[in-house]
Amino acid sequence: MQVILTQDVEKVGRRGDIVDVSRGYVRNYLVPRGLAEVATPAKLEEARRRMEEAAERERRLAERAEEIAETLNKSVITIEARTGEDERLFGSVTAANIAEAIEKARGIHLDRRKIRLEEPIRSLGTHQVPVQVHGEIEASVKVIVVPKL
C-alpha cells in the first residue's frame, strides 16, 4: 500500500517520501501515530509538486553556493591581531573571527561551523582556510594575519 510520510520514519523513509508498506503497518502503526497518510491520487500529485519545488529550491541554493564559493576563492581577508614583542599572537584567530571578517569584507554571512579550521591560527602571516559553503561545495579563503598597531 502506498503512503506519503508526514515525518521521518526509521528504516522506512524521510518526510515527504512516497513508500510502499504493508496494509497492517499502515493501519496499525503509521496512520494512528500521524506518521503517514494514505496516498490518494490528489495527495500523490501534491507530494510530487512539493518534491519538485524542493528540488528547484535546492538547485537555486547550489547555484548561489557556487557563486559564493567563487567569490571566497578570490578573496583575501586581512585580520588584525594583538601581538607581543616577539611577534607572537595574544590568543588566536578563531573560525568565528574569520566568519566575522568575511562578513565585514564581502557581506557574506557564514556560520562559523562552516569554516574548517583544524586548530585556531596562532601565528602571523598568510593561511589558506577551507570553507564548506553548501553540501559538497567548498572554497578556500586566503587569510592574512597582521599585527594590530
Curated annotation (Swiss-Prot):
KW Ribonucleoprotein (keyword) present: yes
A single GO cellular-component term on record: ribosome
Key word ATP-binding present: no
Pfam families: Ribosomal_L9_C, Ribosomal_L9_N
InterPro entries reported for this sequence: Ribosomal_bL9, Ribosomal_bL9/RNase_H1_N, Ribosomal_bL9_bac/chp, Ribosomal_bL9_C, Ribosomal_bL9_C_sf, Ribosomal_bL9_N, Ribosomal_bL9_N_sf
Family annotation (PROSITE patterns): RIBOSOMAL_L9 (PS00651)
GO biological process per UniProt: translation
Keyword terms of this UniProt record: Ribonucleoprotein, Ribosomal protein, RNA-binding, rRNA-binding
Source species, domain of life: Bacteria
Molecular functions (GO terms): rRNA binding; structural constituent of ribosome
Family: Belongs to the bacterial ribosomal protein bL9 family.
Stated role: Binds to the 23S rRNA.
The protein, known as: Large ribosomal subunit protein bL9
